[in-house]
Amino acid sequence: MEVAAKLSGARISAQKARLVADQIRGKKVGDALNLLAFSSKKAAEIMKKVLESAVANAEHNEGADVDDLKVSTVFVNEGRSLKRIMPRAKGRADRIVKRSCHITVKVADK
């Protein structure tokens, strides 16, 4: 049994979120939550919420035991980009790209 949780449009770049996703992939849920709780990255806080949602889905919908779950799949896809302008000297402007991503976490029995 595999249960998923997805967050669309998280306001962090996919590159930064993938650094955290690579750390928790394949770990037991308890170990992954512990690792995310003590990580200082912004993506860790977002990823922790998605993982907790996946665990709650498994517990509520499938009646799974939390101690037996592991993170089977984590992937991060690029979302929409917000394009903004930063005024510069002499009438010029720089483009600012505010990136977002879609985070999917799947948990499964061992």
Swiss-Prot record:
GO-annotated molecular function: rRNA binding; structural constituent of ribosome
Any one GO cellular component localisation term in the record: cytosolic large ribosomal subunit
CDD domains: Ribosomal_L22
Record's keyword terms, sorted: Ribonucleoprotein, Ribosomal protein, RNA-binding, rRNA-binding
InterPro entries listed in its UniProt record: Ribosomal_uL22, Ribosomal_uL22_bac/chlpt-type, Ribosomal_uL22_bac/org-type, Ribosomal_uL22_CS, Ribosomal_uL22_sf
Pfam families, alphabetized: Ribosomal_L22
UniProt superkingdom: Bacteria
Cysteine disulfide partners in this protein: none
Gene Ontology annotations of biological process type: translation
Quaternary structure note: Part of the 50S ribosomal subunit.
PANTHER family (UniProt xref): CHLOROPLAST 50S RIBOSOMAL PROTEIN L22-RELATED, LARGE RIBOSOMAL SUBUNIT PROTEIN UL22M
NCBIfam families for the chain: rplV_bact
Function of the molecule: This protein binds specifically to 23S rRNA; its binding is stimulated by other ribosomal proteins, e.g. L4, L17, and L20. It is important during the early stages of 50S assembly. It makes multiple contacts with different domains of the 23S rRNA in the assembled 50S subunit and ribosome. The globular domain of the protein is located near the polypeptide exit tunnel on the outside of the subunit, while an extended beta-hairpin is found that lines the wall of the exit tunnel in the center of the 70S ribosome.
Family classification: Belongs to the universal ribosomal protein uL22 family.
Designated name of the protein: Large ribosomal subunit protein uL22
